[in-house]
Amino acid sequence: MTPLRLLYAVQGTGNGHVARAQALVPLLLAQPNVRLDLVVSGTLVDVGLPLTPRERYAGFSFRYGKSGGIDWFQTFWANSWWKLLHSIQKAPVAEYDLVLNDFEPVTAYACKWRKIPIIDISHQAGVRHPGAAQLLQPRRA
C-alpha cells in the first residue's frame, strides 16, 4: 500500500498551535501508512517541535494595539507581502495527498490556488463552521 503523503502546516507565532502540533505529530508519525512532513510559519515561541520542519516561512503576523485589537496599519507595514506571495507560489503542496493546516497562511493559500485538499484544524475553523454556536442578537425593546 502506498503511504499517504501528509503535510502538516503549523502557525509558529505563539504557543497554542505549536502545542497542538506537539501532541499530534507523534500520533501521525506512529501511523504505518503516513509519510509526514512539517512546515512552520512565523517565529516559534518557547516551545519546540517533535519533528524538524521541512520549510520555515516568515508567514504573516498580526500586530496588536494597546486596546488588544488588531492594529491594521502596523500589521500592513510589518509584513513582507512580496515574501509572503513568493512563499505561497513556491510552497510544495502539490507533492502531497493531503495538507493538514493549523492556521498557517502560506500553505492555506497555496492549496486554495492549486485546488489541493486541505483540512483546517485550528480553533478559527471551528468557530467558522455552520454548526458552531453563534452569538445571539440582542432583542430590541
Question: For each of these PLM feature ranges, what is it?
Answer:
Residues 69-106:
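Conserved nucleotide-sugar donor-binding subdomain of glycosyltransferases
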Residues 44-46, 99-114:
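An aromatic- and histidine-rich active-site surface loop
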Residues 117-141:
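Active-site-proximal region of nucleotide-activated glycan assembly enzymes
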Residues 3-4, 8-15, 30, 34-83:
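Conserved nucleotide-sugar phosphate-binding/catalytic loop shared by glycosyltransferases and other
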